[in-house]
């Protein structure tokens, strides 16, 4: 296990509009505001998303299994923001629902806003953490110093 103790820094409230890309918007806020570590909360609607719902296989490297969410539908999510070698990267897990059916996983692949998405970013200061590429797993994983 790795862990560090930090403090809550700035708290950013954002509203995303119809059709906006969730990852692009949140990562651009982090870039503009120079946020290196944060917790992220979202609530609102998704128009569509490709969602990782577990691994298709684990060997030799993790291959994600995707399911498509065709909205519009409701979403509630929690995630983290840490930099990798290219800048801020959002890691988000969400529960997405429509017509009494739900899908839980890691939305990727062009997750788009339906009507409104309310975002809260809670900056974490005083820690040294970043996403580093793990060759064995083929993924960027969190590394806390």
Residue ranges and their predicted role:
Residues 1-90, 95-145:
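N-terminal intrinsically disordered, cationic/polar leader segments
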């Amino acid at each position: 296990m790795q862990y560090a103790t930090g403090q809550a820094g700035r708290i950013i409230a954002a509203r995303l509009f119809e059709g906006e890309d969730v990852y692009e918007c949140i990562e651009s806020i982090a870039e503009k505001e120079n946020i290196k570590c944060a917790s992220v909360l979202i609530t609102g609607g998704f128009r569509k998303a490709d969602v990782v719902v577990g691994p298709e296989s684990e060997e030799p490297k993790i291959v994600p299994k995707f399911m498509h969410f065709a909205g519009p539908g409701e979403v509630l999510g929690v995630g983290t923001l840490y930099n990798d070698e290219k800048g801020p990267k959002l890691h988000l897990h969400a529960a997405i629902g429509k017509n009494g059916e739900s899908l839980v996983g890691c939305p990727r692949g062009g997750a788009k806003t339906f009507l409104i998405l309310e975002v809260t970013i809670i900056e974490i200061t005083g820690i040294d953490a970043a996403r580093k590429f793990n060759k064995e797993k083929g993924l960027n994983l969190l590394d806390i110093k």
